[in-house]
């Protein structure tokens, strides 16, 4: 029975996808285990890659600034580096904080 309960979210995703194939995954918030299940569904045997940021990078923006070459007197270089860092969004930013589509999930498949 534990195995059945484990696959319940995946079965729910499959049901939603089959009932409205054009709208079920147009764009959705996917977080935690739901995000992992969706990646398994989209990527299948290819698998997927995910490299989360360390807790230090998430919690301390000053550390991220220093690692990007920022700090006092960095000026335009610091601004440019922060803009580039913001453009490099991870899957959690794309799909949990914001919303994402199946096509965006496929970018994380091997």
From Swiss-Prot:
Cited Gene3D superfamilies: Insulin-like (1.10.100.10)
Transmembrane spans: none
CDD domains the UniProt entry points to: IlGF_insulin_like
A GO cellular-component term linked to this record: endoplasmic reticulum lumen
SMART domains: IlGF
Major subcellular location class: secreted
Propeptide regions on this chain: 57-87
Protein name: Insulin-2
Signal peptide: 1-24
SUPFAM superfamilies in UniProt: Insulin-like
Positions of disulphide bridges: 31-96, 43-109, 95-100
Pfam families: Insulin
GO biological process: D-glucose transmembrane transport; ER overload response; glucose homeostasis; glucose metabolic process; insulin processing; insulin receptor signaling pathway; intrinsic apoptotic signaling pathway in response to endoplasmic reticulum stress; lipid catabolic process
Molecular-function GO term, any one: zinc ion binding
Sequence similarity: Belongs to the insulin family.
Species the sequence originates in: Mus musculus (Mouse)
Cross-referenced InterPro entries: Insulin (IPR004825), Insulin-like (IPR016179), Insulin-like_sf (IPR036438), Insulin_CS (IPR022353), Insulin_family (IPR022352)
Keyword list, A-Z: Carbohydrate metabolism, Cleavage on pair of basic residues, Disulfide bond, Glucose metabolism, Hormone, Secreted, Signal
Superkingdom of source: Eukaryota
Subcellular location per the Swiss-Prot or TrEMBL entry: Secreted
Summary of the function given for this chain in its UniProt record: Insulin decreases blood glucose concentration. It increases cell permeability to monosaccharides, amino acids and fatty acids. It accelerates glycolysis, the pentose phosphate cycle, and glycogen synthesis in liver.
Subunit composition and interactions: Heterodimer of a B chain and an A chain linked by two disulfide bonds.
């Amino acid at each position: 029975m534990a195995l059945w309960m484990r696959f319940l979210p995946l079965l729910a995703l499959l049901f939603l996808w089959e009932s409205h194939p054009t709208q079920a995954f147009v764009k959705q918030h996917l977080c935690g285990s739901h995000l992992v299940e969706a990646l398994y569904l989209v990527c299948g045997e290819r698998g997927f890659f995910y490299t989360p940021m360390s807790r230090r990078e998430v919690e301390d923006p000053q550390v991220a600034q220093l690692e990007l070459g920022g700090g006092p007197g960095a000026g335009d270089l610091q601004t440019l580096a922060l803009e580039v860092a913001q453009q490099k969004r991870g899957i959690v930013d794309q799909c949990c904080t914001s919303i994402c589509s199946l096509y965006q999930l496929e970018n994380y498949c091997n």
